[in-house]
């Protein structure tokens, strides 16, 4: 069951004292876009996932860190490149990506949430734009759809 239907991904972001912002925990939502919309679900830690992340490893595991490209804004959880790679390699996927983050926040995410998690591979999806995010002390956010 979907908790709510929204028109902006700002409705799924919340303040996080360690990272600046993260996804709202325990969310089940449909976001509407120009293609009709997509579904997202977050776990209790506030990461886009249909499962809770646990340390005990039962098969190959890949951890993903990144910004909106790795979090996959505009795409349902199961259609993200991280999840498709997990299916292809028969691996468990923990996607720690958060929209709008730089590599500094991604490092903090690893340090706080994933440092003790057993993994076979860690993938960091980084864009040149992330370097600019790291350099600024304050960055105003603008929603992609509403431009506000």
Question: Can you name each region flagged by the protein language model?
Answer:
Residues 1-25, 104-148:
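Interaction-surface signature
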